[in-house]
Regions:
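Asp-based, Mg2+/Mn2+-dependent phosphohydrolase catalytic module
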Residues: 1-11, 103-106, 119-218
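Hydrophobic beta-strand core positions in alpha/beta domains
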Residues: 113-114, 191
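Residue-level signature of catalytic and energy-coupling elements of molecular machines
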Residues: 20, 116, 151
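Residue-level marker of regulatory loop/turn positions in helix-turn-helix DNA-binding domains and
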Residues: 94, 115, 147
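Short, flexible loop segments at the rims of nucleotide/cofactor-binding pockets, characterized by
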Residues: 88-92, 117, 186-187
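N-terminal helical cap/lid subdomain that shapes the substrate entry/recognition surface
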Residues: 3-110, 133
Length: 218
């Protein structure tokens, strides 16, 4: 499908963060490898990437091999995410074409929001580190909704916060769980191939698959 066919008529753009606004997957993968070894568990790249879009608690329970209490999962999450931020900080940058797309949306009067499964500290790290917080009318993190992707909660929460009906929203995602969540919310979805292959994202029924935001700027 051509970009215009997906983007035309949109009143809001809702962006996932990890792997979408920022191409940071490699640093999350490195952090999970180091972190999981601390707990005597070796994860493969395929496992980590395959779980992209799931909650951190899901990851922690896979590492432990058992259910985790809320306190235990939170403690482990804080440890892993601190490691990730340390690894990624010297490389923090917007994904190619993201700034241009955000600027174009602003000129067109399209409302922008962030809806992420990331913890608040990671979202603050990116938005404040890149000085783009004021671009977004709403920022939704994992503490603001009950069910993680592929449930639609994060995107529906974002749409409610900005006052735009789901059919008028376009979601930008990089993960299969995110694509499924966007469709479950009744939204169109553009998927980037930063963490999943084109074939995988097309099989998940993404409305449009692109390698980067620059393809949307033609």
């Amino acid at each position: 499908m051509k970009p215009n066919a997906v983007l035309d008529g949109a009143k809001a753009y809702i962006f996932d963060m990890d792997g979408t606004l920022v191409d940071n997957l490699a640093y999350h993968v490195r952090a999970y490898h180091i972190f999981s070894r601390r707990y005597g568990h070796e994860l493969t790249d395929a496992q980590i990437i395959g779980w992209t879009g799931a909650t951190n608690r899901y990851f922690m329970e896979r590492i432990l091999g058992r259910p985790a209490s809320a306190d235990e999962a939170k403690r482990m999450e804080d440890e892993k995410e601190s490691l990730y931020r340390t690894l990624y900080a010297p490389h923090l940058a917007l994904a190619p074409g993201a700034r241009e797309l955000l600027d174009r949306a602003h000129r067109a009067g399209i409302v922008c929001a962030v809806a992420s499964g990331a913890p608040t500290q990671n979202i603050d790290f990116v938005l404040d580190g890149l000085r783009i917080r004021d671009v977004f009318a709403a920022v939704v993190d994992a503490s603001q909704y009950a069910r993680g992707k592929p449930a639609p909660d994060c995107f529906l929460t974002a749409a409610a916060k900005i006052g735009v009906a789901p059919p008028d929203c376009v979601v930008f995602e990089d993960a299969v769980y995110g694509v499924q969540a966007a469709h479950a919310a009744g939204m169109r979805v553009v998927a980037l191939t930063t963490s999943s292959s084109r074939a995988t994202l097309e099989a998940a029924s993404a409305d449009l698959v692109v390698a980067s935001f620059t393809e949307l700027m033609a």
